[in-house]
A protein has these predicted regions:
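ABC family nucleotide-binding domain
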Residues: 2-227
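C-terminal boundary and immediately downstream tail of ABC-type ATPase nucleotide-binding domains
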Residues: 216-218, 224, 228-251
Length: 251
């Protein structure tokens, strides 16, 4: 637990009478890339959203970047501090359509971190260069492709200089030919040592870039371990079936 960026023990989450997470336990270490996979409705996105308190757990223990997220009454200041250190990239990019790309990137650093406009602008431009979109600073989101929007969303998250990045199916809404450009940026971040938790259906990415993988099924962790080993030689019948449907071939 000493090197844990995220530690969770017996985590439960329900929506009304629907139990979504049923006693999930695990740990994500600093510098790791961990993929969370599983069929629709298994709870993977809900678990991810618990990691930056977009959802509050109903039971169990959850420590993220040293903060106890099982506490029911975190202050607004505590939540803002958490979300500054635990960035999130959503399936839908959620860029503000009436603002330029640059303004989308500088808004949170100015409002939350109290950065000066010049400082936030310089940082935003450097991260746009990092994701290969330096020339798009003055563009509006509707002038970008889906892949470009998602890369801007990643740059926006990086502008908060997070310790942890959460990705909720970042490529699932993209045309297949645009997926690669987003995964390339994510791979670069992984190589630089960013702690990343990725809910994904991109099994090749999970196998090649991920250190470990959690396979969720019906609200529980059915299998976990080294990403390449788990995805190449799954132990459970359910995971074998899932992978065969994802890849189109029998495993």
């Amino acid at each position: 637990m000493e090197n844990a960026a995220i530690y969770f023990q017996d985590v439960e989450k329900s929506f009304g009478t629907l139990s979504v997470l049923k006693g999930i336990s695990g740990q994500i270490n600093r510098g790791e890339v961990v993929s969370i996979i599983g069929p629709s409705g298994c709870g993977k996105s809900t678990l991810l959203r618990c990691f930056n308190r977009l959802e509050q757990i109903n039971g169990g223990q959850l420590l993220v970047d040293g903060m106890d997220l099982a506490k029911p009454n975190l202050t607004r200041k505590q939540l803002l501090g958490l979300r500054a250190k635990v960035g999130m990239v959503f399936q839908q990019c959620n860029l503000f359509p009436h603002m330029t790309v640059l303004d989308n990137l500088t808004l949170a650093p100015r409002k939350v971190l109290n950065q000066a406009p010049k400082e936030s602008s310089h940082m935003a431009r450097s991260y746009l260069e990092k994701v290969g979109l330096g020339e798009k600073a003055d563009a509006n989101p509707d002038q970008l492709s889906g892949g470009q929007k998602q890369r801007v969303a990643i740059a926006r998250a990086l502008c908060m200089e997070p310790d942890i990045l959460l990705f909720d199916e970042p490529t699932s809404a993209l045309d297949p030919e645009l997926v690669g450009e987003v995964l390339m940026v994510m791979k670069q971040l992984a190589e630089e040592g960013m702690t990343m938790v990725v809910v994904t259906h991109e099994m090749q990415f999970a196998k090649e870039v991920g250190d470990r993988v959690f396979f969720l099924n019906q609200g529980k962790v059915e299998e976990q371990g080294n990403a390449r080993e788990v995805l190449t030689s799954p132990r459970s019948d359910r995971l074998r079936t899932f992978l065969s449907r994802m890849s189109g071939t029998l495993v």
